Regions:
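C-terminal motif of bacterial Sec signal peptides marking the signal peptidase cleavage site
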Residues: 16-19
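An extracytoplasmic/periplasmic, membrane-proximal ligand-sensing/linker region
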Residues: 40, 167, 171-173, 177-178, ...
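Pocket-lining segment of extracytoplasmic ligand-binding domains
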Residues: 83-85, 93-95, 122, 159-248
Length: 312
């Protein structure tokens, strides 16, 4: 009888400890380990863990679409997402067949570049040249998958016109290095580690001209963007492409005080983030062209610093 009692007490203690650990852990939804969401999520977790009474844990995911589903279903608490994908998820439009809500914005962080990599000696010089080629369009539930489909369509192509693969950045870069892939799409801050690691062997394809104009007009969220020369080894010229804003979001169930503290720590430590290296990150950038309401905790911080944002 005593043995059974001890086992029960031990089991209850473990359950209580596990529950406490879960309750006091904030899950951060990021992306591929060789993408910028994961890198910046790791930086964010390190800063917050040094300035908080809870533990912030980085979670690898497929990317924006997955993060929006996960935060809506309460599997993660804060997440990095593309603004264009976020807007579609929030409103149940685009590639989303229903609304995914339960989250609000903390801050717009930086502009991600839509990058299309091909082998350096390839005869592919335009998106139009991808017809019949093996192309990674991005992982399922990633933001890049939505971008790649839209861009192919703008050039008169679709998934059935290419040998479509759905790989992570890491796996796509590995496949290209091994000669098993003709091209891959990557939407991420630059430089992106997955591309940096093979930069001597690849070139980037531009998205420019009338097609870029049409895409920015058709889809709210795209902006014209330049990948500056020498961003990657061997890249001697600017590459004109499109960009989308990265937004950090928080679950609506997270307390106002917690989100206010997160927001404050981001701005107090902005010099420690890789995404702030080009000096474009400030309160104006963080709050402009964010297409969903802000969390009340973030709003409180902005208001105290003279910036008003919508919360509903």
């Amino acid at each position: 009888m005593k043995k059974v009692l001890y086992i029960l007490i031990a089991a209850i203690s473990i359950m209580a400890f596990s529950g406490c650990g879960m309750k006091n852990t904030v899950q951060i939804g990021t992306g591929d380990v060789n993408g910028t969401y994961y890198a910046y999520g790791t930086e964010l977790a390190e800063i917050l863990n040094n300035n908080s009474d809870v533990y912030f844990k980085v979670r690898k995911t497929a990317g924006s679409a997955a993060n929006l589903r996960l935060i809506s279903q309460e599997y993660v608490d804060i997440a990095f997402v593309q603004s264009d994908v976020m807007k579609d998820a929030y409103n149940g439009t685009g590639y989303f067949d229903k609304e995914y809500k339960g989250y609000s914005a903390i801050a717009g962080l930086y502009t991600e570049a839509i990058q299309v990599a091909v082998p350096k000696d390839s005869d592919i010089n335009s998106i139009s040249d991808l017809y019949g080629k093996s192309v990674s369009l991005g992982e399922k539930e990633s933001g890049v998958l939505q971008n790649s489909k839209q861009i192919l369509s703008a050039y008169g192509l679709n998934e059935s016109m290419v040998d479509a693969k759905y790989l992570s950045y890491t796996d796509a870069a590995k496949a290209m290095k091994n000669g098993n892939l003709d091209a891959f799409f990557c939407t991420a801050g630059t430089p992106t580690r997955a591309i940096t690691e093979i930069s001597d062997d690849i070139k980037l394809i531009p998205i420019d001209g009338t097609v870029a104009n049409r895409l920015t007009e058709q889809y709210n969220g795209y902006v014209k963007h330049t990948i500056k020369a020498n961003t990657y080894d061997g890249q001697t010229e600017d590459i004109e492409t499109l960009g989308v804003k990265t937004v950090l979001i928080a679950s609506d169930k997270m307390s106002d005080d917690r989100v206010k503290s997160i927001t404050k720590n981001i701005f107090d430590n902005s010099n420690k983030f890789g995404f702030a290296k080009d000096d474009t990150f400030d309160m104006n950038f963080a709050t402009e062209n964010v297409t969903i309401p802000f969390h009340k905790g973030a709003s409180e911080y902005y208001a105290e610093n003279g910036v008003n944002v919508e919360t509903e």
